[in-house]
From Swiss-Prot:
GO terms for biological process: translation. Belongs to the bacterial ribosomal protein bL12 family. Homodimer. Part of the ribosomal stalk of the 50S ribosomal subunit. Forms a multimeric L10(L12)X complex, where L10 forms an elongated spine to which 2 to 4 L12 dimers bind in a sequential fashion. Binds GTP-bound translation factors. GO terms for cellular component: cytosolic large ribosomal subunit. GO terms for molecular function: mRNA binding; structural constituent of ribosome. Pfam families: Ribosomal_L12, Ribosomal_L12_N. InterPro entries: Ribosomal_bL12, Ribosomal_bL12_C, Ribosomal_bL12_C/ClpS-like, Ribosomal_bL12_oligo, Ribosomal_bL12_oligo_N_sf. Keywords: Ribonucleoprotein, Ribosomal protein. The gene is rplL. This is Large ribosomal subunit protein bL12. Forms part of the ribosomal stalk which helps the ribosome interact with GTP-bound translation factors. Is thus essential for accurate translation. SUPFAM superfamilies: ClpS-like, Ribosomal protein L7/12, oligomerisation (N-terminal) domain. It comes from Moorella thermoacetica (strain ATCC 39073 / JCM 9320).
Length: 126
């Protein structure tokens, strides 16, 4: 049996009180905390300055809203754009609205939108 398996078996045999003591001892020994990280709430006033740079969006998401009548052509274009397999591309098209590509430049987003619309899809850029 490996060391890891031996440790797991030993931990299985401990009571809740002993497990609590073990956690405290590990925290002290290694200088870590077993507590879950707490998300910091941002004050509404602090968020206001961050809104000004947000107007100059540099990354865009291309969302497939609807495949339209030429679904096969849309699947082909989705495969070309994303390098997904046939099954994955078909699932993405079937589950529309879904993002096709995320965090791309404006030029790339416009190019993808044009290709998808040419294939018969309805597309949105966010």
């Amino acid at each position: 049996m490996s060391k890891v398996q031996e440790i797991i078996e030993a931990v299985k045999g401990l009571t809740v009180l002993e497990l609590s003591e073990l956690v405290k001892a590990l925290e002290d020994e290694f200088g870590v905390s077993a507590a879950a990280p707490v998300a910091m709430a941002v004050a509404p006033g602090a968020a206001a300055p961050a809104e000004a740079p947000a107007e100059e969006q540099t990354e865009f998401d291309v969302i497939l809203k609807e495949a339209g009548d030429k679904k096969i052509n849309v699947i082909k274009v989705v495969r070309e754009i994303t390098a997904l397999g046939l099954k994955e591309a078909k699932a993405l098209v079937d589950e529309a609205p879904k993002p096709v590509k995320e965090k791309v430049s404006k030029e790339e987003a416009e190019s993808i939108k044009a290709k998808l619309e040419e294939a018969g899809a309805t597309v949105e850029i966010k």
